[in-house]
Amino acid sequence: NTLVKNNLQHFDSWASTFGETVTAVELTPEGTGYRAKTRFAKFYNLPELMAMFKEVADIKTADMLELPVPEAHFHNVAVKPSEMQKEMVASLAERAEKVRGGGVDSSVDNMLKITNDGRKLALDQRMLNDMLPDFEGSKINACVDNIYRIWEKTADKKSAQLVFCDLSTPKNDGTFSVYNDIRKKLIERGVPESEVRFIHEADTDVKKKELFQKTRKGEVRVLLGSTQKMGAGTNVQDRLIALHDVDCPWRPSDLEQRSGRIIRQGNSNPDVDIYRYVTEQTFDAYLYQL
């Protein structure tokens, strides 16, 4: 009724009253150039908007509640692409130009396929071709270095870490998986296999409860999972000391959901670290600017 009363029942009317479109230069999805893009990005007339919203909502933020949560320290870990990744990015750019120019049927190639390949390539070159070598400077190896360093440093406290990755989930068919690669490398360095677990292994509520309990006790010290499976409802914060975002999800709210697993009431650590890994000159840069 309030929207109708103020002639705001149609989105165009609401958007012109409270929103503003902004045109800015941003990276192209394939990561090789820039373009001007107009987005619905700013709000104004905020007092009127909030007054209208508060007619149907009672707002309490975490800051207003003053919940005792740890202080988070964010670290952006940027790595250089391999020569093979650079070549593959160039190939993605060529594909994108053909798609934009209408030179290829959408059933053969399209921007969705290209962006999906771009996400995989930014994660690890073996995602597109598992016959390619393990690049020493990859963000997967940078992540393994940090996980192991923190695992070793916090051994006396049995602190735990979460590793988020939405792509390349565990597989048993012999194909390359980032999950399997990270666990294998940690075990090779001396981390007990029982301390590195996948959320996907807990395929029932009973198994999930047991896994969460072991993580809270410090028996499982590295837990890997996707935002969908290890986001909302995952309460393992008791000993969490670090969180690793190996890839970037599509929605900013998913990053908040991930961080909410460690920046959480009940965490015994006053300070925690959140690492976000980016492969330069790839689709990672496009995703994080969104």
Report each predicted region and the residues it spans:
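Active-site flanking residues adjacent to catalytic metal/cofactor-binding acidic residues
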Residues: 1, 165, 246
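Short, glycine/charged-enriched secondary-structure capping and boundary segments
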Residues: 1, 94, 176-182, 212, ...
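Hydrophobic/aromatic-lined pockets within catalytic cores
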Residues: 2-5, 19, 152, 248, ...
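Inter-lobe coupling linker of SF2 helicases/translocases
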Residues: 2-133, 149, 274-290
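Alpha-helix N-cap recognition
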Residues: 7-10, 167, 251
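Short, solvent-exposed loop/helix junctions and linker helices
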Residues: 43-46, 137, 172-176, 249-252, ...
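Conserved Helicase C-terminal RecA-like lobe
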Residues: 67-230
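Conserved RecA-like P-loop NTPase helicase motor core
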Residues: 187, 191-286
